[in-house]
Amino acid sequence: MAFHILKNENHKTNLVPIVEDILSIDSAMRFAAIIDLKGNISEAIMKKGKTSLKSQKEEEHFCKQVALGRRMRNEFNKSLGKVNYVHIERERVTQIVVYPKRKTIYVTLEPKLNMERKMELVHLIKKKTAHL
């Protein structure tokens, strides 16, 4: 699915089509968020028909933690290299975090997918968000 980068009247990128595009990659996708470098949610969508495993307050807190994790990982970029992505397997959900230049992409998906498919999803998400 292709999309155009839309800008609103304040010349800010409309992130809704990007988040929708991420969610459409696979039926196992549950939630997608674009987070600024301070941990504020710029845009987030829970896929229709899916129920959140966290409250909105917990989701916002988790996004702040994702941004903090990014800052902590950046401390090791010089010695270890940049982080390609973060992948967390939990009992009820898989969490993936990708780091474009100015935003952080956080997605959750059903854990049922095999590892090869999850790596394909990481690649697709990185490709769709490289400009952020």
Language-model features and meaning:
Residues 1-132:
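Non-catalytic interaction/Regulatory regions outside core domains
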